[in-house]
């Protein structure tokens, strides 16, 4: 299982979805690391979409799981886009770990997206945050945003976001 709009975004951008299902255990879902690495190699994967924590299964990935996944992606030069919109919704006894905070090499190979929409129930304001630690990648991202015509900021969304986080 995965958040279904991921596949829609992939299709809308004329990209091909390479699916590696989670492994369903008796008590929790786990990541199929071997399957992911095999798919990366066999399918020439260049971008990995990570749902951290996972939606809809609710798994909060451990630091070791995230590092293992990151190590695989770094080894094969795969960019990780970590959707961390549900970071504030974790089970008691668990702690969300921001992917970019795992260390410099992980930060250099990722984009982290967050939003106040889930936590504060303000999805209608259509605002999100994109964190790109890698300067070169950030410049490329900004260039693509400009090229696509997203030059106008949502003023109400920014005010709502700022108020929610205060």
Which functions belong to the PLM regions below?
Residues 1-17:
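Substrate-binding/gating loop at the entrance of the active-site cleft, primarily
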Residues 6, 69, 99:
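Aromatic/hydrophobic pocket-lining residues that form π-stacking "cages" and hydrophobic walls in ligand
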Residues 8-10, 72, 102:
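Hydrophobic/aromatic ligand-binding patch that stacks against planar heteroaromatic rings
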Residues 15, 75-79, 107-108:
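A short helix->loop->beta-strand "cap" motif at the edges of active sites that frequently abuts
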Residues 18, 81, 111-113:
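Structural detector of well-ordered beta-strand residues that form the stable sheet scaffold
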Residues 22-94:
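Active-site phosphate-binding strand-loop segment of PLP-dependent enzymes
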Residues 109-166:
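PLP-dependent aminotransferase class I/II
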């Amino acid at each position: 299982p995965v958040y279904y709009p991921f596949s829609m975004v992939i299709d809308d951008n004329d990209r091909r979805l390479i699916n590696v299902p989670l492994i369903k255990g008796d008590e929790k879902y786990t990541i199929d690391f071997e399957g992911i690495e095999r798919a990366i190699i066999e399918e020439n994967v260049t971008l990995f979409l990570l749902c951290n924590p996972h939606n809809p299964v609710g798994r909060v990935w451990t630091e070791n799981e995230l590092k293992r996944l990151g190590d695989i992606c770094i080894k094969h030069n795969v960019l990780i886009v970590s959707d961390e919109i549900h970071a504030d919704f974790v089970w008691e006894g668990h702690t969300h770990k921001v992917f970019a905070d795992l260390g410099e090499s992980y930060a250099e190979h990722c984009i982290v997206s967050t939003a106040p929409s889930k936590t504060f129930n303000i999805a209608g304001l259509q605002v999100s945050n994109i964190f790109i630690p890698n300067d070169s990648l950030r410049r490329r991202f900004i260039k693509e945003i400009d090229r696509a015509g997203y030059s106008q900021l949502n003023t109400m969304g920014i005010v709502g976001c700022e108020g929610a986080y205060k």
